[in-house]
Amino acid sequence: LKVNASINTFVGGYLCPYNLGHDGVLFRDESKKGWASVANLADGLTNTMDLLDDETDYGAKFFNPANDDVQNFVLQLLADLAKYDLDGIILDRCRYDDYGLESDFSDISKQKFEEYIGETVANFPADIMAPGTDEIPSDQPVYFKKWLEFRAKVIHDFIVKAREKVKSVNNNIKFGVYVGAWYSTYYTSGVNWASPKYNTSAYYPKWATSDYKNYGYADHLDYIFLGAYASVNNIYGSGEWTMEGFCKNGRELLQGDVPFAGGPDIGNSTGWTDGGQSAKIPDAIDACISNSDGFFAFDLCHVKKYDYWNAFKTGFDKYLESIEE
């Protein structure tokens, strides 16, 4: 049995709905408020720790990935984690927060962006994105795509540091990440999980600069997990939002830099939420494992809740029989 530890990388707290409270360093330590993301909302720049209505603002509270203090804090957590007898460490949520394109517009991010481009942004944030922008604008501000490139660089450079930190403690521990397989829109999270050999701008010129590819981080990983979270009726097919298509795209995007496992969300994706899908499990396994280097499922609690054990055994047995033929 191999043991891999997953860490909620840039999450600093959680606000629960239904008056159930909150937890995390961002809530425990008021002095860390400056570590939280700042969102470029329609109402103006807003620290996400000022958004505390548990009916509308519940969910994870993210750190600003560009904050050096945040990065040092997380790197120390990884160093501590690497001291345990683990086979691997997987970074989850190593990205910008769920506000997507609206994050992060802190003074720190502004300063680092200006240092990166060697210019002063005279009209911030409007020269990057108008307040409340949550999708590609038809009329792009002057720094829009360069800002997306910068965000990808922030995450890329942290991945490099994180790998170095883990390996410095225990070089035998494998280092990897979990990401969503929907690459065509994953730029909203500030992540380029592809190989740097994949020329992103050739396929996505609306949002990728010619240098965006330089911040693909697949070549810094020992493995990667791709969430192929298609609906129960979109298991086979091509293109995104089919499980098979997600995994086939993943192979093209990763360019052989790193082995990868694709897998479904069997508890939250459309058609999976109420259980009763045992007959679909073997197909989901086949679609993913036949087009990647492995398989994972999100999440074990759903396997137990809906008693999918036999369905998984059937799927794995079919796969093992197919490779023995």
What are these regions (language model features)?
Residues 4-84, 136, 140-144:
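Active-site-adjacent "subsite" loops/lids of carbohydrate-active enzymes
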Residues 8-12, 93-96, 180-184, 229-231, ...:
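Active-site beta-loop-alpha junctions enriched in small/polar residues
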Residues 56-75, 141-156, 229-238, 266-272:
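The substrate-binding groove and active-site-proximal loops of carbohydrate-active enzymes
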Residues 62-96, 156-158, 165, 213-216, ...:
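An active-site-proximal structural segment forming one wall of the substrate-binding cleft
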